[in-house]
């Protein structure tokens, strides 16, 4: 992202109330784009739309030098349902991207997990990214703020064009990232952004789910 407020402003959208259900289907996009998803724009508008694929529906994101995301509020204790799973696919990664610099903080696909705090500077996020060059499995503080931890779930263009299913233990990842147990989960976000590099990127997301 271009400026530090981009990551932090996404954190501001976290919140909500309600008891944790037995299973939380964040979205499978079979009924289109749920209005619970809220657009958060930073520089231009990444185009998000639900498209048909393989007999079902998925969320497609297209960025052309833009940065905007979709944010959905969720209020639950991640220790009750720590597993986040999803499917995603990218057309390619961003050759000019560099996860270690502000100028290169662009990603073909990423999923934010937002843990809000009443004192905003203590709000933290896990950013599950399809990295451009960062080795798979790397944990790296975001170039703008150490309160956003980048986690390279996939890396590079080798598997571009293929649907991959991911499953992450948010509690374990939070402990590794920040050295303590997580607070309540406040929101989930998806973002495809290329505002720093001016590149083009297309990604697809589907079957976002929280389980035990």
Located regions from the model:
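Extracellular beta-strand ligand-recognition surfaces/modules
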Residues: 106-111, 146-156, 160-200
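Extracellular/lumenal carbohydrate-interaction signature centered on repeated Trp-anchored short motifs
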Residues: 73-84, 157-160
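Short carbohydrate-recognition loop motifs
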Residues: 49-69
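Extracellular/luminal beta-rich ligand-recognition
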Residues: 104-148
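Solvent-exposed strand-to-loop "edge" motifs in beta-rich extracellular domains
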Residues: 87-93, 116, 171
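Extracellular beta-strand elements of beta-rich domains used
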Residues: 29, 188, 207-210
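Extracellular carbohydrate-recognition regions
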Residues: 21-41
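Bacterial N-terminal signal peptides
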Residues: 8-17
């Amino acid at each position: 992202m271009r400026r530090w407020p981009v990551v932090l402003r996404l954190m501001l959208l976290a919140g909500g109330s309600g008891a944790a259900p037995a299973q939380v289907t964040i979205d499978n996009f079979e009924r289109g784009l749920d209005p619970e998803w809220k657009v958060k724009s930073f520089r231009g508008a990444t185009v998000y739309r639900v498209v048909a694929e393989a007999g079902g529906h998925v969320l497609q994101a297209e960025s052309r030098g833009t940065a905007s995301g979709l944010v959905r509020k969720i209020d639950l204790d991640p220790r009750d349902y720590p597993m986040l799973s999803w499917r995603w696919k990218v057309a390619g990664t961003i050759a000019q991207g560099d996860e270690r610099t502000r100028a290169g903080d662009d990603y073909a696909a990423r999923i934010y997990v937002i843990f809000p705090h009443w004192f905003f500077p203590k709000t933290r996020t896990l950013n599950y990214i399809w990295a451009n060059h960062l080795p798979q499995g790397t944990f790296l503080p975001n170039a703008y703020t150490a309160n956003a931890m980048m986690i390279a779930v996939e890396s590079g263009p080798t598997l571009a064009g293929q649907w991959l299913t991911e499953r992450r233990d948010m509690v374990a990842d939070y402990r590794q990232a920040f050295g303590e147990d997580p607070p309540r989960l406040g929101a989930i976000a998806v973002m495809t952004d290329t505002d720093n590099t001016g590149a083009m990127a297309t990604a697809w997301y589907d079957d976002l789910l929280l389980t035990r």
